[in-house]
Amino acid sequence: MKKIFTFALATLMAGNMMAQMHGVLNFAGASTANVLNQNVENPSDTVKFEMVNAASGNITLPNITNDNLVISSFTIANVAFTMGANHVVTMPDQTFATKVTVGGEEKNITGSSLKGTYNMADNSLTLNLTFKYGAMPFDMTYSIKAYYIKPVASAITVNVGGAFNYNNENVTYSVRK
């Protein structure tokens, strides 16, 4: 009987731990891309984070534009992280490699550095990456300070000049949490 209760308790705890693993988390914020001292700033990029397990996750970056160069969105799999004190998650400096298909051609992305933090107190994500794209001989850096956003669906009513009402019952917008 004791084994049955122990098994039931372990099953409930495992289920509770899995419930803590969220789906994809979206973070929006200002970013900077740099190649050969040419900075391109974007006031609002969205980065996605999906937990794989309690020590790693997948990070998806948006399209990165630097003058005439557009790097398609790509995912970095199994980014390692540790949970620290004061609800701060740290992604220690690590290398990465991934591929992206552009116009039917596969391009390698080789990262010499990825590091970042997620602060649960203010829901902010900071990432800094250095990588080479395809046959590009120069390093590209990408950095972003973003905040967790959550889609909210609710009706919205706008009154213009006290004379015109606009109602939309089916609107979804992202709210910074």
Where are these regions (language model features)?
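Prokaryotic Sec-type signal peptides and long signal-anchor helices
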Residues: L9-T11, S31, N168
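Intrinsic-disorder/low-complexity peptide segments enriched for small residues
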Residues: F7-T11, I59, F138
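Predominantly extracellular/secreted and cell-surface proteins with exposed
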Residues: V40-D45, F49-L114, V175-K177
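Bacterial Sec-dependent N-terminal signal peptides
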Residues: M1-N26
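The phosphoinositide-binding surface of pleckstrin homology
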Residues: A33-N37
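Helix-rich interaction surfaces within compact, conserved domain-sized segments
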Residues: T117-Y118
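Edge beta-strand at a domain terminus
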Residues: Q20-A28, N39-P43, S73-N86, S113, ...
